[in-house]
């Protein structure tokens, strides 16, 4: 009787594990399908422009700094956010990244700086209208919140030293699944975050 009871419990556990696995797999496929549908509009788009608002938040400072600028996204792999007349910029040109902070330029590459590799892959996926496979990116999570698709990139460091050297702990992109608009990009860092919100999108 005890053996049967133990066997039954084991069977229940196995079934629960299988159910959980298949449910999470189904959820993942569904969310990726939602994302693919949300960005399909970009297949027929060469350039996207929008107004940008940058919010810089520091935990130690009570008041956020808010500035204005523009967003330009262009096939095949160009993304440019220019703030305050170009004094602050975030530029992706293929694998090359440039950050301009208060007029000072800093350059890096996704090939030498892995924390930007998935960032590049996600934006290229968007600009290609959902062509490609993001499911193999272990540092990317795709979720749905109301009418929005949320993409969270959490770079994985291979050591504590590498983790300390990371500029950002995570990137969060918000895409409207009905309009295909990139609504926000948030970059979390130690002691604060930088968030860009975008309005007035024009698809050309």
Label each PLM-derived region with a short phrase.
Residues 1-11:
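N-terminal secretory signal peptides that target proteins for export/translocation
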Residues 26-30:
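Sec/Tat signal peptide C-region and signal peptidase I cleavage site
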Residues 52, 79-83, 97-100, 151-153, ...:
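Short hydrophobic/aromatic-rich beta-strand segments that constitute the beta-sheet cores
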Residues 70-121, 194-195:
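An acidic-aromatic
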């Amino acid at each position: 009787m005890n053996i049967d009871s133990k066997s039954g419990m084991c069977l229940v556990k196995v079934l629960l594990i299988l159910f959980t696995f298949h449910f999470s797999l189904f959820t993942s496929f569904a969310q990726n399908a939602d994302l693919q549908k949300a960005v399909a509009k970009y297949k027929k788009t060469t350039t996207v422009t929008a107004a940008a608002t940058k919010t810089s938040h520091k935990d130690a400072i009570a008041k956020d700094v808010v500035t204005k600028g523009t967003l330009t996204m262009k096939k095949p792999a160009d993304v440019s956010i220019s703030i305050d007349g170009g004094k602050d910029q975030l530029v992706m040109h293929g694998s090359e990244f440039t950050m301009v902070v208060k007029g000072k330029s800093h350059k890096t590459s996704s090939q030498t700086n892995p924390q930007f590799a998935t960032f590049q892959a996600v934006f290229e996926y968007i600009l290609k209208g959902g062509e490609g496979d993001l499911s193999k990116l272990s540092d990317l999570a795709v979720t749905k919140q109301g009418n929005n698709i949320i993409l969270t990139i959490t770079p994985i460091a291979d050591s504590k030293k590498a983790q300390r050297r990371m500029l950002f702990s995570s990137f969060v992109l918000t895409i409207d699944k009905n309009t295909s608009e990139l609504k926000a990009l948030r970059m979390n860092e130690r002691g604060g975050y930088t968030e860009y919100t975008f309005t007035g999108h024009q698809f050309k």
